[in-house]
Amino acid sequence: MSPKTETKASVGFKAGVKDYKLTYYTPDYETKDTDILAAFRVTPQPGVPPEEAGAAVAAESSTGTWTTVWTDGLTSLDRYKGRCYHIEPVAGEEDQYIAYVAYPLDLFEEGSVTNMFTSIVGNVFGFKALRALRLEDLRIPTAYVKTFQGPPHGIQVERDKLNKYGRPLLGCTIKPKLGLSAKNYGRAVYECLRGGLDFTKDDENVNSQPFMRWRDRFLFCAEALYKAQAETGEIKGHYLNATAGTCEEMMKRAVFARELGVPIVMHDYLTGGFTANTTLAHYCRDNGLLLHIHRAMHAVIDRQKNHGIHFRVLAKALRMSGGDHIHAGTVVGKLEGERDITLGFVDLLRDDFIQKDRSRGIYFTQDWVSMPGVLPVASGGIHVWHMPALTEIFGDDSVLQFGGGTLGHPWGNAPGAVANRVALEACVQARNEGRDLAREGNEIIREACKWSPELAAACEVWKEIKFEFKAVDTLDIL
């Protein structure tokens, strides 16, 4: 290098490492309506100040890297950088902080959940200066929301398609989840739908295995639901899982489902990926298919309180990517889910405008600007004794899904479906009459048993079954 070049470089660019907080911690910054806002739970390594940790998150998830680079001078970092604009300690937790970060909208590709997550959570979670990091919530600005199609149809359109109003929808996951032949699988589907359920479902890991190839399953399930429809006069559906090893194969399965004339298909959106999910959601809107979403693998990401991504963020991402149903926990069943937290993200799925409410874990006000809503699905370890609580907790705009709670009935699949339908109708009628489901739930179910032997048998089988474990992911002390 010539002396002349050295002089010019030293004037325009100073190499070396500097603290992130000098550039990316900006407590005086006023957030813009177009910013994506993030709330991170940050646990710094010993000796790392919280301001430096928060700034590091902002830097590494936007324009920064570990050292100064001369190409910084070729762009406007002030325009494009993420900013940590506020930090607060977490009450009752040692060395944990909530760091609020604002990202300029120009950092993100329009209509791409994949790109949004690649930026915000793609690399920073392995950063050595942090012991742990969790993305608690995102505020998606309306300008960005409007770049997404969202759910293929939404709650009201689904009800109109099914001609079912004024109650939760009822479903059942076919069990055993693996090992049945396609014909026996279709038989179970028919019996459950004939007994009074609205939907039956492929389990999340039912794809196209040697014991039951996808095309055979689709054909037998279509035959089952058409037969049940003809006999009951109700529109029925089975969630045909289109998840596959490639996007091309996934779309081939969705096209075949449409050709069969069935109303709904299914996708495992986390294992399948957001790009595949958005592709399928667009196809479903264009071709009149409803889309059921399973959240398989979510607990790997969201269950630990100090590290990962909270499910409320994954729920928002799903609403943007597209899905008409998504599993959302039960509060009362076998799967993780504290009541206030669950109801917080249920509102984020269904409602058009949700106010900030830290008592339910909602860090930001969210405006969906008329994007269709998503039906939450309660599924996992629930049975007829849970029906009053589920109806009271989730309300009409939900899907209550009983797998073992249908197929485990001592008299068979169809009586199991009858028991669930009778229990639901009894709870809805009692609620509409002004009775308190939370206080009188067991009494309401016992009264219904008097005129439904199927329900009475189910109540006897599951009268002692409870899943009483403390939730791992709980709300912070405010």
UniProtKB/Swiss-Prot annotation:
Its main location: plastid. It comes from Drimys granadensis. The active site is at K175, H294. HAMAP family: RuBisCO_L_type1. NCBIfam families: PRK04208.1. Keywords: Acetylation, Calvin cycle, Carbon dioxide fixation, Chloroplast, Disulfide bond, Lyase, Magnesium, Metal-binding, Methylation, Monooxygenase, Oxidoreductase, Photorespiration, Photosynthesis, Plastid. It is found in: Plastid, Chloroplast. It is an enzyme of class 4 (lyase). One of its GO terms (molecular function) is magnesium ion binding. GO terms for biological process: photorespiration; reductive pentose-phosphate cycle. RuBisCO catalyzes two reactions: the carboxylation of D-ribulose 1,5-bisphosphate, the primary event in carbon dioxide fixation, as well as the oxidative fragmentation of the pentose substrate in the photorespiration process. Both reactions occur simultaneously and in competition at the same active site. This is Ribulose bisphosphate carboxylase large chain. The modification N-acetylproline is found at P3.
